[in-house]
Regions:
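Active-site-proximal alpha-helix that buttresses catalytic centers in soluble enzyme cores
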Residues: 19-110, 114-119, 157-191
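All-alpha RGS (Regulator of G-protein Signaling) helical domain and cognate RGS-like helical scaffolds
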Residues: 111-121, 125-133
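Positively charged n-region of N-terminal signal peptides that target proteins for export
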Residues: 1-5
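A short, structured loop/turn motif at beta-sheet edges
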Residues: 134-140, 171-173
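Hydrophobic h-region of N-terminal signal peptides that target proteins for export
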Residues: 8-17
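Generic beta-sheet signal
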Residues: 31-33, 137-146
């Protein structure tokens, strides 16, 4: 059992290697899904009283720091000449705002958050798996702005930090592989 734990740690760590010039080159060529967890939020707020996705006053929202992080991510993507096509987002205010600040647009989509099925429904994340596994043509990348839990549910550990991006290679038929991750603090050093 102990050996299994070490192997799992090893393979998880190697699957989540630090970003490199190769990863940036691949992103410039396109064909990937960039799954971004929303940027920094105010954890003193919660979603328990929200009446709809448009009810931003009763949701956990971005902080000023989170807004600046989203703008910075967008500026780095532009600086690195990473082509962005569709920008899909969970309909929550924090994910929509993160996407709009970073990429200038966002299309609300329930599948991006892993819903609307009930939490215990085994098919809850089928729509998200389809988004992550659908072929993206070369020359552009698709962005999904969403949450940490749905991605962890379909891709496994480790959890994405706020503002972290998992670079996903779609493989079709609900299959995909995570080829890298980019933390907020990684962007300035990427070339």
């Amino acid at each position: 059992m102990r050996v299994l734990k070490y192997l799992l740690l090893f393979f998880t760590a190697s699957a989540w290697a630090q970003p490199s010039a190769d990863l940036v080159r691949q992103l410039r060529e396109g064909g990937y899904v960039l799954y971004m967890r929303h940027t920094s939020t105010d954890f003193s707020q919660n979603d328990s009283r929200m009446t709809s996705y448009e009810d931003c006053e009763n949701q956990r929202n971005l902080t000023d720091k989170g807004r600046a992080e989203a703008r910075d991510i967008g500026a780095h993507v532009k600086r690195l000449r990473i082509p962005i096509g569709e920008v899909l987002a969970s309909p929550f205010c924090r994910t929509m705002e993160s996407a709009r600040l970073a990429f200038g647009k966002a299309q609300a989509m329930n599948e991006a958050r892993g819903g609307p099925a009930q939490p215990q429904d085994p098919s809850r994340y089928d729509g998200l798996k389809k988004l992550l596994s659908t072929h993206v043509p070369k020359g552009r990348n698709v962005v999904i702005s969403s949450h940490g839990n749905p991605f962890h549910a379909v891709a496994g550990p480790p959890y994405l930090a706020e503002g972290e991006i998992a670079v996903v290679e779609p493989k079709g038929d609900a299959r995909f592989s995570v080829v890298g991750r980019i933390r907020i603090e990684d962007w300035p050093s990427l070339k």
